[in-house]
């Protein structure tokens, strides 16, 4: 589905804060294209692509053919091969039998809801593993980039890629600023890792 106006408006604001001058265009596709063109010029493609992905609407399963906004397809469906998920199996059966189950809306809602739960479990597991690693590496320096300026959060981009840390002595550094930090504390139960900017 197309992202909400509020999300696209925030995207434009965030990109402007990074120093890349962009404006809302006539529609969402034109706005995203405009942002990506400006990102290439500023050499901030990777960072701005992260912001564009964050602005997108969460994918969900639907009994209606809503297309794929991000890919620009008016008709779209997807399953993996070999079949690994229940959603893949349902779609494969529909394609094979050319019949849509009567309870397809309930099936889609159930799959979407449970997929979110599974994602949450995976993120929870990863965050605990990161916290365990950090607890064994207290005092070590790592390289991070700021990913949330409001909550003073950064993500490691070396040694243990993807580990999120709270920046204890954050002083308003710019989004995506890269810096060295020292791991100060890590709590496996709360999954909170605190680091100090060097």
Model-predicted regions and their roles:
Residues 1-198:
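Structured C-terminal cores of nucleic-acid metabolism proteins
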């Amino acid at each position: 589905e197309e992202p909400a106006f509020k999300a696209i408006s925030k995207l434009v604001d965030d990109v402007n804060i990074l120093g890349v001058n962009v404006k809302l265009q006539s529609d969402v596709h034109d706005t995203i294209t405009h942002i990506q063109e400006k990102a290439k010029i500023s050499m901030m493609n990777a960072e701005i692509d992260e912001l564009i992905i964050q602005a997108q609407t969460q994918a969900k399963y639907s009994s209606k053919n809503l297309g794929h906004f991000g890919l620009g397809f008016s008709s779209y469906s997807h399953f993996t091969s070999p079949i690994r998920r229940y959603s893949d199996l349902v779609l494969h059966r529909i394609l094979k039998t050319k019949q849509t189950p009567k309870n397809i809306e309930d099936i889609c809602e159930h799959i979407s809801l449970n997929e979110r739960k599974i994602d949450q479990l995976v993120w929870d597991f990863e965050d605990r593993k990161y916290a365990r690693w950090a607890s064994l590496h207290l005092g070590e320096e790592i390289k991070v980039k700021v990913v949330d300026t409001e909550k003073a959060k950064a993500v490691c981009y070396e040694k243990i890629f993807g580990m999120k840390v709270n920046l204890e002595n954050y002083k308003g550094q710019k989004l995506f600023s890269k810096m060295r930090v020292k791991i100060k504390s890590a709590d496996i139960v709360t999954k909170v890792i605190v680091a100090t900017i060097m």
